[in-house]
Amino acid sequence: MTKWVYNFGAGVNDGNASLRNLLGGKGANLAEMAAIDLPVPPGFTITTEVCTAYYENDRNYPADLKAQVDAALARIEQAVERKFGDKDKPLLVSVRSGARVSMPGMMDTVLNLGLNDDTVLGLAKASGDERFAWDSYRRFIQMYGSVVLNVDHHRFCLLYTSPSPRD
C-alpha cells in the first residue's frame, strides 16, 4: 500500500524537511517543526504524488486515500477532543494547498472547514462568542465559494451586511 498521508503533531511525526518533494514546502516544514518538538497543532499532509496518481488514473483518487485521510482525521479528533461535524464540540480544520516549490500568493486556503448551520451553534456556545462563530462561518462560506466553487469573491461582498443573522 502506498503511503499518501503523512501525520504531524500531537506526538506523531511521519516526515521531516528532507521530504519537501513529497510533502510540499508547507507540509515538510510542519513535519520538521513537529520533529524538533515545536508546538504544532496536529494535522496531516496529503502527498504531492496524489496529484500525479489522480491524473494517471483518469482523474480518480487512489483507492486507499480515503481510508488514510479518515485515519488521520480520527487521530486529530482524539488529540484535540473534538469531532468533525459534531454539533457540540466541532473540529474545524484548515485546508492549505502546497507545492514542491514556494509560490507566494498562488496557492489557495480554506479555513474553518467543518462549520455548517448546526456546528456554528456549537462553536458559538463553546467560544461564548456568537458574533465570532457567525463571522467564522461567513468567512468559511466566502473562502469555500471562491476557492472551491470559483465564485467571484466580490459577489460575497455585495451580500455581506453583518456576521450574525440576528444583528
Predicted regions and their residues:
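Charged, compositionally biased N-terminal leader segments and the immediate start
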Residues: 2-19
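Conserved phosphate/anionic-ligand binding catalytic regions in large, soluble enzymes, centered on
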Residues: 22-50, 93-117
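Extended active-site and interfacial segments that coordinate phosphate-rich ligands
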Residues: 24-30, 109-143
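Structural signal for hydrophobic packing residues in well-ordered secondary-structure cores
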Residues: 34-37, 69-84, 114, 141-148, ...
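Glycine-rich loop at the start of a catalytic domain that most often binds anionic cofactors/ligands
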Residues: 51-62
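Glycine-rich, N-terminal phosphate-binding loop and its surrounding beta-alpha-beta segment
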Residues: 60-102
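Extended, charge-enriched "interface" segments that sit outside catalytic cores
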Residues: 153, 157-158
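Conserved small/polar residues in nucleotide/adenosyl-binding loops
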Residues: 160-167
